[in-house]
Amino acid sequence: MTRYPDLYVLRHGETQWNREGIFQGVHDSPLTTMGREQAAHQGKILNRVISDWSTVDIYSSPQGRAKTTAEIALAGVNRTADLHAALREVDTGDWAGLHISDIIDADFRMAKPYTVEWLSAYFSSPNGEGYEVFKTRLLEFLRSLQKPTVIVTHGMVGFVLRGLYLGLTFEQMAGQVGGQGVVFHLSDGREIVLKD
């Protein structure tokens, strides 16, 4: 298994569309009050586990919800995140902007979250980004990292990036946990979910 530096992966805080059950993909919606609180909590977690911020790189997706999360989480650290296009959310094509119930009507596999069927459906959205293209951009990013790195990104990016780091197969990735307001710490081929 390829060895990578430690990662601290954050999914953006809750957005208005997350709350309403609308797929965002390449679109954006603002963080809710809860989302801003989640980002602040992630910042507290990071400050507890990173004693010397000069030893880490920090990257964020260029999409607004991730950038705002990074700004809130890094407040008081005197560091900003470098924006990296590889960390933008998967393009869900024609599903972007649709409610999850409409997507389930179009592809029943989306009704089974965190299963192989669900993951397969996610990457077969009409006019969306396929898994191999998505995986390639994330692997290129992962291989470019030289030191411990904080990454502020999106649900599916974090899901697949963490799976690649851990050496999981596509099928194994489906069983991972997700979440907002937490930090996924990856080190030496293992993952710990930091909640407090």
Predicted regions and their residues:
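Short, well-ordered beta-to-alpha junction loops that form the rim of enzyme active sites
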Residues: 13, 61-63, 86, 153-156, ...
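Phosphate-handling substructures
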Residues: 75-137, 195
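A glycine-biased structural micro-motif
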Residues: 55, 97-100, 105, 147, ...
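Short hydrophobic/aromatic-enriched beta-strand-loop microsegments
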Residues: 30, 77-85, 169-177
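Active-site-proximal alpha-helix that buttresses catalytic centers in soluble enzyme cores
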Residues: 5, 11-79, 129
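Domain-level recognition of soluble alpha/beta enzyme cores
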Residues: 166-195
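Short glycine/proline-enriched coil/turn segments at helix->beta-strand junctions
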Residues: 74-80, 143-149, 188-190
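Generic beta-sheet signal
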Residues: 7, 56, 144-156
